[in-house]
Amino acid sequence: MMARRDPKSWAKRLVRAQTLQKQRRAPVGPRSPPPDEEDPRLKCKNCGAFGHTARSTRCPMKCWKAALVPATLGKKEGKENLKPWKPRAEANPGPLNKDKGEKEERPRQQDPQRNALLHMFSGKPPEKPLPNGKGSTESSEHLRVASGPMPVHTTSKRPRVDPVLADRSATEMSGRGSVLASLSPLRKASLSSSSSLGPKERQTGAAADIPQPAFRHQGPEPLLVVKPTHSSPEGGCREVPQAASKTHGLLQAVRPQAQDKRPAVTSQPCPPAATHSLGLGSNLSFGPGAKRPAQAPIQACLNFPKKPRLGPFQIPESAIQGGELRAPENLQPPPAATELGPSTSPQMGRRTPAQVPSVDRQPPHSTPCLPTAQACTMSHHPAAGHDGAQPLRVLFRRLENGRWSSSLLAAPSFHSPEKPGAFLAQSPHVSEKSEAPCVRVPPSVLYEDLQVSSSSEDSDSDLE
């Protein structure tokens, strides 16, 4: 009987049994997991739900077929007002409706008053109201347009004048004719009519009464420079610089009642070129060429003399008055002078080249001074090729005009530098001319302080 069975039919049955088992395993609907599989400490990274991980088959992100989609609940037509009601026309309106009607009638009653005011300011004839009630809206349409301010025409009042010009009388304004040359062109035109009312009056005390301009210049207010002229018989007419009209706010109004507070401007001649030669701290004054002068009294016009330039062998007077003598540093000491050691003298001290003042600078007061006349010797140490040279003798003399003169004197051979008395015995003519005893000074000090050159004889003749 086993042989009679077909193997193909048996295989078909096996396949059917396997497919049925697969269909039973597949989830038909949303299956609730067993309680032992849920763990609240786990969280899925895909859907963010707790109880399973991202690799679990329970995640709805992996099986979209099992996910539930929220169904639409349909339209709610009852909440939408598809057929709004029309307002009812009540025959007997309530108290609220009466108040609304009164508010609508009030602006209509105010229309005639508004039209009358518009007619006064604008000068337009009042428009007749239209039967449909649009006249009130059209009359006020020009007020809603963004335009400039409405001009107010008043014929009874005159335009307001400058307060400074208003409180001036006609006699005060007549005296401004002498100052019209320094005013701006606009001020000239405004004051020309007022100055022609009365005759010109000559003022002798202070500057003319000038109206203060509407704008003021920041900073100190400059004064008015008045120069007297010889052509006027009374000496009261003054000239004002023409360049003063270029600056704004140059003229300041000097009222009669405020003269006790501000001093009057005195007329004194002042050189116009004094501003170029004044230094710092001096009072400045302006002339015709000044653009913006500073406020300063006119009397203090000082012209300081220029500082004279000194020649290479001239000594400043400040050093002569204090009894100080300084030599200009024009030469460098020879290398032979550095062979001697440092030595000091009672009348001349050793100084460094940094302490030796130059001719152009002001010498310090800490330098040593020399007597009125003194004859000094300076042993010349030549180079190796010049042996047996004679020492140099210099005679300093003070002249009558306050200057110093130096001269070189010829001296015999000097073999013993340690004995200064022998030198005085050999040169008697030097001791007669000198007013102080001669003191031997080391050559190193003389080279640094005096710096005597071979051309000093020529300079002596020039100074005398």
UniProtKB/Swiss-Prot annotation:
UniProt biased composition (Basic and acidic residues): 74-89, 97-111
Leader sequence residues: none
Top-level taxon of the source organism: Eukaryota
Region (Disordered): 1-42, 69-387, 410-437
InterPro entries: FAM90, Znf-CCHC_6
Pfam families on file: zf-CCHC_6 (PF15288)
Biased amino acid composition, Low complexity: 180-197
Entry's family note: Belongs to the FAM90 family.
Record's protein name: Protein FAM90A7
Species this protein is from: Homo sapiens
